[in-house]
Amino acid sequence: MIMDDVKATVLSILQDLTGEDVSNNMDANLFDEGILDSMGSVQLLLELQNQLGIEVPVSEFERSEWETPAKIVAKVASLQ
């Protein structure tokens, strides 16, 4: 999957989960902004697994690696 497809899928998942369009600010800290919380993180990981086949055990989830849309896209791309 090319990076643009990964980005579009991640942004779509984030919008579905949070109701927020974060595409305008790819460096926004989703946790500090109150857009994503721990439950949202689990839902995000499940959706990434369902839609992209990415498996990240919750025990290996490092919040600092997943805190912005840009970091999420990069992390997903690195796991494919």
Swiss-Prot record:
Pathway as given in its UniProt record: Cell wall biogenesis; lipoteichoic acid biosynthesis
Main localization category: cytoplasm
UniProt GO BP: cell wall organization; lipoteichoic acid biosynthetic process
GO cellular component: cytoplasm
Disulfide bonds, paired cysteine numbers: none
GO molecular function: D-alanyl carrier activity
Keyword terms of this UniProt record: Cell wall biogenesis/degradation, Cytoplasm, Phosphopantetheine, Phosphoprotein
Subcellular location: Cytoplasm
PTM characteristics: 4'-phosphopantetheine is transferred from CoA to a specific serine of apo-DCP.
Domain Carrier: 1-80
Positions of post-translational O-(pantetheine 4'-phosphoryl)serine modification: S38
UniProt xrefs under PROSITE patterns: CARRIER
Function: Carrier protein involved in the D-alanylation of lipoteichoic acid (LTA). The loading of thioester-linked D-alanine onto DltC is catalyzed by D-alanine--D-alanyl carrier protein ligase DltA. The DltC-carried D-alanyl group is further transferred to cell membrane phosphatidylglycerol (PG) by forming an ester bond, probably catalyzed by DltD. D-alanylation of LTA plays an important role in modulating the properties of the cell wall in Gram-positive bacteria, influencing the net charge of the cell wall.
HAMAP family found in the cross-reference section: DltC
Record-stated family: Belongs to the DltC family.
Protein name from the UniProt record: D-alanyl carrier protein 2
